[in-house]
Amino acid sequence: MTELSRIRNFSIVAHIDHGKSTLADRLIQETNTVSARDMKEQLLDAMDIERERGITIKANTVRIDYTADDGQDYVLNLIDTPGHVDFAYEVSRSMRAVEGSLLVVDSTQGVEAQTLANVYQAIDADHEIVPVLNKIDLPASDCDRVAEQIEDVIGIDASGAIRVSAKTGQGIHETLEAIVHHLPAPKGTRDAPLKAMLVDSWYDAYLGVIVLVRIIDGTLRKGERIKMMSNGTVHHVDRIGVFRPAMQPVDELGPGEIGFLTASIKQVRDTRVGDTITHEKKGAETALPGFKPSQPVVFCGLFPVDSAEFEDLRDAIEKLALNDASFSYEMETSAALGFGFRCGFLGLLHLEVIRDRIEREYDIELITTAPSVIYHVYMRDGTMRELHNPADMPDLTHVDHLEEPRIKATILVPDDYLGDVLKLCQDRRGIQMDLTYAGSRAMVVYDLPLNEVVFDFYDRLKSVTKGYASFDYQMIGYRQDNLVKMQVLVNDEPVDALSTMVHRDRAEARGRAMCEKLKDLIPRHMFKIPIQAAIGGKVIARETLSALRKDVTAKCYGGDATRKRKLLDKQKAGKKKMRQFGKVDIPQEAFISALKMDG
């Protein structure tokens, strides 16, 4: 049991690639928390995909013992948070579990959009913030300019910013001293009823669900019965401990401490992130503020390329859902793609990570249908329905109006590319809310429809700015707009997997582009195939794929013209009949590329 005055809980805030996980590695190394033999790069990023993409997805934690220059022994608890916008809720609750943050900024790059988003969350959580300028060993490093930028853009004093190189280890000791002397100790009462915040949870095949907790008040011991305050479920605590980063059992956790508990919990869904844990008897009366269950934002269909792998896909998705409470799924069937699942995600990176994990860890090839968002469909009878899949759109005669989700996008971009970025946002039906300058960079704030962003906005933004722009967004609610469902018909048959929701002004251009793309991708058949884009009963774009034909008159030498005519008419009748009964095979690549179009 550590005295409160000797505990420091902190997180590291940074944009992707600014060196957050490397700094965490150095802090662990400097304090000999892990033996030199067990040390490896990005120690806290356990998933392969985290290491490979160089991003942190789950919040990870480590307890570091440190003897400061004043001779006192301190316990430092670091929570390494994700930096990406999709995992913003993981960030916000990790922030509430600690009292201070190290703001890591790459001294060659400066402040980026996700740095801003996460710093504002830290400020909202009343954190003390210590700025750290990283990568000072690089020749392009410019600490004075970046320190000035931190003061201009974020508005915190950066005159005493610590200059470090996480790669070489320079400045790490100063960072540890700053954590001890500048960050506040946690507050809490040992004798009060137990209040613990559930920071994260994940599934372990042997122990069941492991729950990461921050004790606010009271104490937690092995063998006690605990209650989750959001759903009232009761569990018996099997073991408690701390991470150094390996699990180490302890007898009790007291106020201000961060550790884990296991209680034979079967599913991650029973442990909701941000929930309050208390004792079953004589528990706390009120829960901690700020709990909200995470809601999926982007939906798409996942189908196996080989339909025999459907059961394997089901197993894979069920196992991933055990570990990820923000990932939802339900079965769906598609006439074109067979059996699969309709899945909900927090955002596009979350979608990519899950898809990559299924393909890599379970070795299943997938087709992903076009990502779509949740629309609100207001019916004539006054009811409101949520529309997850454009193929389920009700008949327009019963619909009063549609509303789509909007986001507030913050884009940081060098001046030279500002025009291109503004044009891209206008093209995506954006409404400009703000434009400010900080040094040679502009900060643009736009109100954009989420539907226009989920497709390929991020890729387009990176390409028009040569990769220099950074982008962050948050949901701001729903607004009515003139939206229609566009269907694609191949040989007069609607293809459900290609249905999308588009704005009426855009429908024609989008439909034409899709038809042209399909015309190139579908192989020619023995009969003529019309490819059409339609809204309701009205066709707005059409391409015709011409038939392969055999030269039936080749055998006729001279002779009577009626003989040739007869053969040609016979062929024509055959083609007509074939078109009525013929099935068009649409190859898998056609789906994938038609959905990837730049619209």
From Swiss-Prot:
Which segments constitute the tr-type G domain?
Answer: 5-187
Q: Which GO terms describe its biological process?
A: positive regulation of translation
Report the InterPro entries cross-referenced here: EF-4, EFG_III/V, EFG_V-like, EFTu-like_2, G_TR_CS, LepA_C_sf, LepA_CTD, LepA_IV
GO CC field: plasma membrane
* Catalytic activity, reaction form: GTP + H2O = GDP + phosphate + H(+)
Query: What SUPFAM superfamilies does the record tag this protein with?
Result: EF-G C-terminal domain-like, P-loop containing nucleoside triphosphate hydrolases
- PANTHER family reported for this sequence: TRANSLATION FACTOR GUF1 HOMOLOG, CHLOROPLASTIC, TRANSLATION FACTOR GUF1-RELATED
The record's annotation in NCBIfam families points to:
lepA, small_GTP
The family annotation for this protein states:
Belongs to the TRAFAC class translation factor GTPase superfamily. Classic translation factor GTPase family. LepA subfamily.
What protein is this chain from? Elongation factor 4
Q: What is the lineage of its organism?
A: Bacteria, Pseudomonadati, Pseudomonadota, Alphaproteobacteria, Rhodobacterales
